């Protein structure tokens, strides 16, 4: 530990103590908040089922930065490189298309054995795993419908895929000793004016009920459902709207997933957390950065990321909110994208933990909004960076931008050699 870092740390402890914050306790709390990294940043959502196939479902990964992972071995190596540069507890979020098999496997036939390598790898790296059925980039989703499809046979295929995915998710939780959160998102919708908006939602309701009919130990598996405002090719109507899934999660007591990019550009999910928590047992967050639409840019340490973290901490939602990331930028180094986004999420959580929330709440309750605003703004200038650097030091990860040197070396020695 450098003398300069020690001095900054001691000064930071004193500054935060002056406003009633124990920085050691803040770091202990930060170690209770894992962030689930998404595997699909590493290969632009290609997966291993059909890596050369098109990405569909109204989502898009733009850019052609060299060095993307082409198989599971490369993807895990890239993840390990990123993990080494991110302090504190982490998880990994997998999609069904990241299965491994010597022969083709239909999506309704996926089994735990197809993800055994991921589980062994997660054990070795002390990670929890989360999961997602992949209801896009498939011939049977090409017309824009899956779980709400009017054709009963196609609809059943997707029901069976989601049921098989739940068994994989439960296997993750059983093997790793931490529950896997399995999130269901479907692209179902229509491009233009829709006459019958009810029937697809009725079919989706019934399909989801069948999907979750098999009971699993919540210590192993947690169901979540995710809404979206629109997607490319589904601009006019989305079957799984916010109102639909809020009603579903409330009535079935599943977790509700809030994705930062899945709402109107003037809406923010930080404002939805406290409302949803009154009705659902758990929330899954997909922290992202929408630029004019659900563009899934790399997460910044911006106002909304900070507001999301503050909501979790202020309301002590550590055990009810699961923090995941969802972005995929193919225009920059993909390992760096993971590191930037995940470190920013953790920085936001730390800053929230260093806030004198009790004092601010008292000022608010007494109607002293002047002091509330003044202290919130002064809080931004306190030396949280010194606390962050100590956290990185204790977790044997680089402080500041030093991590970029490691990424550049990895790019030169490994990524640049991929064709």
UniProtKB/Swiss-Prot annotation:
Q: In which pathway does it act?
A: Carbohydrate degradation; L-rhamnose degradation; glycerone phosphate from L-rhamnose: step 1/3
Q: Which domain of life is it from?
A: Bacteria
Cofactor(s) of this protein:
Mn(2+)
Matching entries from SUPFAM superfamilies are given as:
Xylose isomerase-like (SSF51658)
Q: State which gene encodes it.
A: rhaA
The organism is: Salmonella paratyphi B (strain ATCC BAA-1250 / SPB7)
Alphabetical list of NCBIfam families matching this protein: PRK01076.1, rhaA
Instruction: Answer yes or no on keyword RNA-binding.
Output: no
- Location in or out of the cell: Cytoplasm
Q: What is its EC number?
A: 5.3.1.14
What protein family does this chain belong to?
Belongs to the rhamnose isomerase family.
Q: Which GO terms describe its cellular component?
A: cytoplasm
| Annotated protein name in UniProt | L-rhamnose isomerase
Complex and partners: Homotetramer.
Q: Per the record's keyword annotation, is Transport included, yes or no?
A: no
One GO term in the molecular function aspect is: L-rhamnose isomerase activity
Coiled-coil segments on the chain, per record: none
């Amino acid at each position: 530990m450098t003398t300069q870092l020690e001095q900054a740390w001691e000064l930071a402890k004193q500054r935060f103590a002056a406003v009633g914050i124990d920085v050691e306790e803040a770091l202990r709390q930060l170690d209770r908040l894992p962030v689930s990294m998404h595997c699909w940043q590493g290969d632009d959502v290609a997966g291993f089922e059909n890596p050369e196939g098109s990405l569909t479902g109204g989502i898009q990964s733009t850019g052609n930065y060299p060095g993307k992972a082409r198989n599971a071995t490369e993807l895990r190596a890239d993840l390990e490189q990123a993990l080494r540069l991110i302090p504190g507890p982490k998880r990994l979020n997998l999609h069904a298309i990241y299965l491994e098999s010597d022969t083709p496997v239909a999506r309704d036939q996926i089994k735990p054995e197809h993800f055994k390598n991921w589980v062994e790898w997660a054990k070795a790296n002390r990670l929890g795993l989360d999961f997602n059925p992949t209801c896009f980039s498939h011939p049977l989703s090409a017309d824009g419908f899956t779980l709400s499809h009017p054709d009963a046979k196609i609809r059943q295929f997707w029901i069976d895929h989601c049921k098989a995915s739940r068994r994989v998710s439960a296997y993750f939780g059983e093997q790793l000793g931490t529950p896997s959160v399995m999130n269901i998102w479907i692209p179902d919708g229509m491009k233009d004016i829709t006459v019958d908006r009810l029937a697809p939602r009725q079919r989706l309701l019934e399909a989801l009920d069948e999907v979750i009919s098999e009971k699993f130990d919540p210590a192993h598996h947690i169901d979540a459902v995710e809404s979206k405002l629109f997607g490319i090719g589904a601009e006019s109507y989305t079957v799984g709207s916010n109102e639909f899934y809020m009603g579903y999660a409330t009535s079935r007591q599943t977790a509700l997933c809030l994705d930062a990019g899945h709402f109107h550009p003037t809406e923010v999910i930080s404002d939805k957390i406290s409302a949803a928590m009154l009705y659902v047992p758990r929330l899954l967050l997909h922290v992202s950065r929408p630029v004019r639409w659900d563009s899934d840019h790399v997460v910044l340490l911006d106002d909304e990321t900070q507001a999301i973290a503050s909501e979790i901490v202020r309301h002590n939602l550590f055990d009810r909110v699961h923090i995941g990331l969802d972005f995929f930028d193919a225009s920059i180094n993909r390992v760096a994208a993971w590191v930037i986004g995940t470190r920013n999420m953790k920085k936001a959580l730390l800053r929230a933990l260093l806030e004198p929330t009790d004092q601010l709440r008292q000022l608010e309750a007494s109607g002293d909004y002047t002091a509330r605003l003044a202290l919130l703004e002064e809080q931004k200038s306190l030396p949280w960076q010194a606390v962050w650097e100590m956290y990185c030091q204790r977790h044997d990860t680089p402080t500041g931008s030093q991590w970029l040197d490691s990424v550049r070396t990895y790019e030169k020695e490994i990524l640049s050699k991929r064709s």
